[in-house]
Amino acid sequence: MVKKLNVQEMILTLQRFWSEKGCMLMQSYDTEKGAGTMSPYTFLRAIGPEPWNTAYVEPSRRPADGRYGENPNRLFQHHQFQVIMKPAPLNIQEFYLDSLRALGIDPLEHDIRFVEDNWENPSMGCAGVGWEVWLDGMEVTQFTYFQQVGGLQCDPVTSEITYGVERLASYIQDVDNVFDLEWGNGVLYGDIFKEPEYEHSKYAFEDSNQEMLLKFFDEYETEAKRLIDLGLVHPAYDYVLKCSHTFNLLDAHGAVSVTERAGYLSRIRRMAHSIAQAFVAEREKRGFPLLKHAQEAKTEVVDHD
């Protein structure tokens, strides 16, 4: 029987597990985004030759998915537990199954299926091969090998594991309504997030200032391009994230037509591609320092042996 960990305990267990596998524990990135993949800890670090292993929780905002806090499973904001390992370990799938064991879920006693589901995020120029992971009939994780990020080929290949925090917690706690989850210390998910869910949904669908958001998108785009020209990759990327979230708000409100939608996504994709190119060029100029660090660490291990 699965021990009913609260959300806090579940996250701590995953952090401890992946830390022991060599992942740095990062903190959530402080700009709105639609998925953990869009954090610079994934988007930027998945490209170029440098190794990168990290794990972090990322609140992910998807305005169109808001349901005023009335739907038991669909949310304006949900949480992802993101694991990035580059280069992808040969036994990454076994690592994942071991992480379920750490949560008290024995793969031999449950129906765990890897269902092919190749992934792409066209607006960010990202694509990969992967699987949805189903646990006793419920999708709880997305497992992806990145092939392309920011329009650049990934070499070496990066592996991404994205746990749906609310979904996995719902399974572990055996609840049908996400707002009934225990977050920690007896406090329910709904006590924390139900009111924000209602307010953000009302804003996205009814009360957002579309004229202002359209203006903001143009200004964010202009600033991102200016910063790219100045070689300020990280501030520029922040503005691309702002463009993406602003577009999502406009899209949720039905403020852009089908034709306009394609145009906005293309504008975001071009900026993301320019930033990816600039980031790799800057890292190369610095001699890819994390690659050197990994080689030195490997040499120290060999010398010690």
From Swiss-Prot:
Keyword Ligase among record annotations: yes
Reactions the enzyme catalyzes: tRNA(Gly) + glycine + ATP = glycyl-tRNA(Gly) + AMP + diphosphate
Example GO BP: glycyl-tRNA aminoacylation
Enzyme Commission no: 6.1.1.14
This protein's UniProt keywords: Aminoacyl-tRNA synthetase, ATP-binding, Cytoplasm, Ligase, Nucleotide-binding, Protein biosynthesis
Predominant localisation class: cytoplasm
Protein name listed in UniProt: Glycine--tRNA ligase alpha subunit
